[in-house]
Amino acid sequence: MEHYISLFVKAVFIENMALSFFLGMCTFLAVSKKVSTAFGLGIAVTFVLGIAVPVNQLIYANVLKENALIEGVDLSFLNFITFIGVIAGLVQILEMVLDKFMPSLYNALGIFLPLIAVNCAIFGGVSFMVQRDYNFPESIVYGFGSGLGWMLAIVALAGLTEKMKYADIPAGLKGLGITFISVGLMALGFMSFSGIQL
């Protein structure tokens, strides 16, 4: 149990997808204007990561990995296309559910919802799972932890952005300039977790 808690804390704080690896920056910067929208996208990314990583782990371990199906057969060259297909399918399901049950969030996310399918944070989570050879329970913990870490980062940035609307920011830094500075400072803060040994 201690191993899984350690893996979860590592995924959320120490190896944060957005602030340690800078993955998923397109949607991270574009949807961080309002906390409510950022929270909705964070939930969506957490859902997709939390399901895509374990599902892809099962497919990789039982089908694609060397000697998984037949002795001497290695289908790992199909990793990318398989992982992307699973992620795209999950995003389509999520899009249909949000359109049916949460139309306001669906409309607020707009074009960025389908872009989750090509969000490099999600593909990065799946790739790290393969690279680190996580088993199924570890992949569940890692997937949800990575998603929650990304959500924590985007909600924190959205909160800062909302506060900065009322701040006296120099004209040259308004918009993306101050956002990049804020993200850099947040990343420095998250770097302090890198010295923690779990």
Swiss-Prot record:
GO terms for cellular component: Gram-negative-bacterium-type cell wall; plasma membrane. One of its GO terms (molecular function) is oxidoreductase activity, acting on NAD(P)H, quinone or similar compound as acceptor. GO terms for biological process: respiratory electron transport chain; sodium ion transport. InterPro entries: NqrDE/RnfAE, NqrDE/RnfAE_oxidrdctase, NqrE. The keyword Cell inner membrane applies. Its EC number is 7.2.1.1. Belongs to the NqrDE/RnfAE family. It is found in: Cell inner membrane. This is Na(+)-translocating NADH-quinone reductase subunit E. HAMAP family: NqrE. Keywords: Cell inner membrane, Cell membrane, Ion transport, Membrane, NAD, Sodium, Sodium transport, Translocase, Transmembrane, Transmembrane helix, Transport, Ubiquinone. It is a multi-pass membrane protein. Composed of six subunits; NqrA, NqrB, NqrC, NqrD, NqrE and NqrF. The lineage of its organism: Bacteria, Pseudomonadati, Pseudomonadota, Gammaproteobacteria, Pasteurellales. Pfam families: Rnf-Nqr. It comes from Haemophilus influenzae (strain PittEE). The chain crosses the membrane at residues 11-31, 35-55, 77-97, 110-130, 140-160, 176-196. NQR complex catalyzes the reduction of ubiquinone-1 to ubiquinol by two successive reactions, coupled with the transport of Na(+) ions from the cytoplasm to the periplasm. NqrA to NqrE are probably involved in the second step, the conversion of ubisemiquinone to ubiquinol. It catalyses: a ubiquinone + n Na(+)(in) + NADH + H(+) = a ubiquinol + n Na(+)(out) + NAD(+).
